[in-house]
Amino acid sequence: TWLNSSGDTQTFDVAFIMVHGTPGEDGLLQKYFENLNIPFTTGSSDSVSTTFNKYLSNHKLRQAGLLVAKSYLIEKGNLLDQDELNNILQLIPLPCFVKPNHGGSSLGVSKVLTKDDILPSIDHAFKTGTPSVLIESLLIGKEYSVGVVPGDDSSPIAMPITEIISENEFFDYEAKYEGASQEITSAEISIELADKIQLNALKAYNLLECRGMVRVDFIVVEENCPAILEINSVPGFTKMSLLPQQLAHAGINVRDLLSRIIESSIAH
């Protein structure tokens, strides 16, 4: 709250959170507004801090029967010896990914081909400021992304699916923000596969108690099984971003959607 020029007390009706990374996707802003009793447009501080923590969110998704990559968590200060490294590689064989456990935009992510590259890749991931790092199994397949937004009755609905064809080895920072990828909306896939992806996106949204607009990234592995790569509680919303492309394809007016999100946040 604040005092205006007339000396009257003013307050915010709602906070529309569009900050990527910390403090918008790790729960800090959400906790601040919760303490002030000001409504906001994402999930709760607990919800977004869970989706920001890849290891924790994957654990919950796996327990619910959703497919995710195998992963091993390394806390900052935990120095790996050769025996421990060999044990990890038995669980997660090469090639694999090393990535920050907290963070987004694919910053600090490395595709590791040899054992000698693992420790430098872990150091690279820790330089992003993350308190922990994941060694994660490599999933091979086509990548897709789908937004989930509130429908007319505020119940979540899945958007048309985007296929991502990256010019790089994976959908990294350059591919996401510098145009080094081709995006096809609506993805040219079977109705059966589209239904699986959209249903799993909605399951993840509800399981992790998301609110507002969210983007769920998938990779489809053998036998048309969609595995969840990441859940973005504050998805990109520029003209280049995936969710606005999906909204346009679905015929959803952006102004109408934002009004709906604000109204449902105030009513929550």
Range-by-range predicted roles:
Residues 190-268:
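ATP-dependent carboxylate activation and anion-phosphoryl transfer catalytic cores
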Residues 1-46, 50-52, 56, 74-87, ...:
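ATP-binding N-terminal substructure of ATP-dependent carboxylate-amine bond-forming enzymes
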Residues 24, 143, 238:
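Short alpha-helical
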Residues 39, 67, 253:
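Residue-level detector of anion-binding/catalytic polar loops
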Residues 113-199, 220-227:
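Phosphate-binding site of ATP-dependent enzymes
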Residues 14, 66, 73, 128, ...:
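Preference for protein termini
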Residues 9-10, 50-141, 152:
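Active-site nucleotide/adenylate-binding loops and adjacent lid/helix of ATP-dependent enzymes
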